[in-house]
């Protein structure tokens, strides 16, 4: 187990906040955070950044804070950032662009409603297609063609309707990025996100056609996740360079649907909630992977945990939320 507290300069400039609302967590609050973390056997790391600096790192298992870790479905939040960067770079026109305009082809067996699905619907998990997650996940990843399998599933709601959390929907976004750009999603992520942030984005699994898995199994270090959170906290700017389109963060943190499990809002790859009275945007992944941004407190928090089965269930995510809430509430 290793805990360090220090200043680590990040490259993003700060959004203006009211000074009275933004105070650095005290040493006592961080000590309490460590104690609470140690009580959670699955938890591996906790990293806290304040005002653009990493002020606290705690490691008690698994890969260290600088080592890549499987972030599971937190990959959906990262893929959303890649999509925003692709729009800023002109690879995609806008979130209103139809998905089919970006794909090389659509199977003839697909419902005509697929023509109504936009990039925004993919980002917000509102494609309307039957989910490939949950009980459908095993059959989907065992299929010979993940993209076609997702596209030919029946519609259970209209495009733009209720949130239907589905990794297949995110995978369609990865396919759209690849086929629209002529680059792999990995190459796009490295060029448009990794390079401006100065972070490593290693290869992760691909489908049978070579499309990088959209929305699962990316490998990123906790420090890299902090950099992505800080990019959002600073309105898409990194070291004076615009990486995400102007207004992207506000759009991403505007709820378009609602989680059927927690009731939290969901925007473009981010859940929206309130912890200790503070507005919080967060991404999450199976087993206890989480990235929190608390803009009014100038804070970004990353938590990684054991990603292997069995699942600790929703209760573990509630415990992670409670860790962050207690940190925010501590005077």
Please report, for each region that a protein language model flagged, where it lies by residue.
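Bacterial N-terminal signal peptides
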Residues: 5-16
């Amino acid at each position: 187990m290793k805990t360090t507290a220090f200043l680590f300069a990040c490259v993003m400039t700060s959004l203006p906040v009211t000074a009275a609302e933004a105070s650095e967590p005290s040493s006592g609050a961080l000590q309490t955070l460590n104690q609470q973390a140690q009580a959670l056997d699955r938890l591996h790391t906790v990293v806290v950044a304040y005002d653009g600096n990493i002020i606290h790192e705690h490691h008690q298992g698994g890969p260290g804070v600088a080592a890549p870790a499987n972030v599971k479905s937190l990959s959906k939040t990262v893929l959303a950032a890649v999509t925003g960067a692709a729009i800023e770079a002109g690879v995609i026109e806008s979130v209103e662009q139809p998905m089919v305009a970006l794909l090389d082809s659509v199977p003839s067996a697909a419902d005509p409603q697929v023509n109504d699905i936009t990039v925004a619907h993919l980002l917000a998990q509102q494609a309307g297609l039957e989910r490939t997650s949950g009980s459908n996940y095993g059959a989907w990843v065992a299929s010979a063609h993940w993209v076609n399998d997702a596209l030919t599933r029946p519609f259970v709601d209209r495009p733009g309707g209720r949130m239907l959390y589905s990794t297949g929907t995110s995978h369609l976004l990865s396919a759209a990025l690849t086929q629209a750009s002529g680059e792999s999603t990995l190459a796009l992520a490295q060029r448009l996100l990794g390079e401006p942030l100065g972070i490593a984005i290693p290869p992760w699994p691909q489908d049978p056609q070579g499309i990088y898995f959209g929305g699962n199994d990316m490998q990123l270090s906790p420090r890299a996740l902090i950099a992505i959170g800080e990019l959002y906290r600073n309105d898409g700017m990194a070291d004076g360079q615009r990486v995400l389109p102007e207004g992207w963060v506000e759009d991403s943190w505007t709820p378009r649907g609602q989680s059927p499990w927690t009731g939290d809002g969901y925007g473009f790859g981010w859940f929206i909630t309130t912890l200790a009275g503070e507005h919080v945007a967060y991404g999450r992944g199976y087993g206890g992977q989480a990235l929190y941004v608390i803009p009014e407190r100038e804070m970004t928090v990353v938590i990684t945990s054991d990603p292997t089965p069995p699942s600790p269930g929703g209760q573990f995510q509630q415990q992670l939320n409670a860790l962050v809430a207690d940190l925010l509430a501590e005077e």
